[in-house]
Amino acid sequence: MATTKNKQPNQFPGLSLTRKMNNNMKTNNDKSSLKKIVRCTLITFLALVLALILIAAGVYGWASMSIDTSLAARGIIWGGSHFDDWKRFPSRVVHASDTPVSFAVEKTDIFDDFTIDGQRLETYLEATNTTAFIVLHDDTLLYEGYFNDSSRDATQASLSVAKSFVSTLVGIAIDEGFIASLDEPVTAYIPELLELDSRFEAITLRDLIMMTSGLRFERDDSNPFSDDFITSHSPNMRQAALNSEIVSAPGERYHYNDYNPLLIGMVLERATGISVSEYLETRLWGPMGAEGDGSWDLDSERSGFERMSVGINGRAIDFAKLGWLFLHGGKAGARQVVPQAWVKQVTLARDAIYTGRGEHSNYYQNYWVLDVENEAYYAEGNFCQFIYVYPAADLVLVRHGSDCGGTYWTGLLGDIALEIEKRMSR
């Protein structure tokens, strides 16, 4: 006979119910605490984000209002150098010539089947972010093309091509007697440098235009505290030049340095008694027959000093006229604009300094680079701005662009000049 066990009744039913209630309350409390923690964390995070936004907005607002007086503000707003920096800076107008030079235009088939890397010339220039390309033969325009929404009247930036204009002004100032010679110490014109360091007395003007001054210069355009950024973006470039530091003996080695042209600019304005822009206009830009107004960037409205290393702007055809002048021994027609002796001094490799850069054997002389392999010389600026002079075939090539377009233009311009020479002799 089957039997069943009697199930023992819960002797403490109230205790079980209490435990369940306590567990539920604990779970609810835990959930409530977690929600509070999440809510507090989210509020704190949002407050921090809002604070950072307000700080950034405040810093940006301060920088925007301080753009004419603060290097740090320019670093925040502008960042590094750009090919169209001329749009950011105040400038002085460099007026066009009263007697502009217009080159004769020759209709030629030289460029009809001219190709580079299998592409037609125009296609290649467009693809490499070129904005202007000019070929002069003697006094005749063989090729003039504009690309990527540029035009004949468009403003092109010199960038460091400006240095070649600056050295030319030094040659003219020596010829006019404003400067005695390149062997004068820079302290003859800027004596306050001696208060900074007595060794400045050993630095000559020649050292400054040969890039052998021995001054410190660190290249890092993205760093607003680097020498590179200071010399191109300072709102007081005279003071920046006076803060330059000697790190090695002058005359011993080439070291590309943008403090050098700043000091040259101070020498020019003190020696001539006028702004460097006015000296450019009256002694070079106008006399060489510039067709359009140019300009020279200023460090700031308050300081009013030219950006000596980079800041000349104008039409591509007028930049070509500097190369044309040098091709003709410093003459614009019958007028001797640049002393012939200066042109010879600049373009002879005998006294040049080896730079140790580039695929060609490049030498530096008075802010020009000598392409020894092709017996040519050129002015070069950042983002591949070029005035390339090839005397053997009486050629001047000018290239402007927003960047290099992945091309080694020094070598390519030499190759183009050689190919044009070959085609002209057919």
Range-by-range predicted roles:
Residues 2-7, 12-150, 178-179, 419-426:
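N-terminal leader/targeting segments and the immediately adjacent pre-domain N-terminus
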Residues 127-130, 154, 382-383:
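Short, small/polar residue-rich loop motifs at catalytic or cofactor-binding pockets
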Residues 139, 157-182, 208, 264-268, ...:
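Active-site SXXK
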Residues 140-145, 187-188, 222-250, 274-293:
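Short, charged, amphipathic alpha-helices and their helix-cap/turn boundaries
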Residues 147-151, 155, 403-405:
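A short acidic/small-residue loop/turn micro-motif
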Residues 176-215, 243, 270-309, 314:
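Active-site helix/loop module of the DD-peptidase/beta-lactamase fold
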Residues 260-267, 308-331, 385-401:
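Active-site-proximal alpha-helical segments within enzyme catalytic domains
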Residues 291-297, 343-396:
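Active-site Gly/Thr loop motif
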